């Protein structure tokens, strides 16, 4: 089977795009390797896991925890289960640093996205990944 590289930023990646893809690739028998800027596990966009902050009133400190629309917009239950399983996987817990990645070592590349520029910017603008 193929060896697939999934580079992710330190934070704010979309948990559904990463975890569901990871789950499908593993289920199909592929080997998955993660890579992050410094070789430490990344953190998904918490807003997409909890739904907090996705409602119209999400910017109001006292109301942030009240989710209505946010519950519909967050990652669904299956994606959250896949994310929880991915967090326990050795490949996710011990990623390569981006500078350690060698193109010849991999058969495929998956570039997942995210919603918030604050964490995704380093990933999108990385000269190493380009």
Regions found by a protein language model. Name each.
Residues 1-130:
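Extended, subdomain-level signal for the structured scaffold at the beginning of enzyme domains
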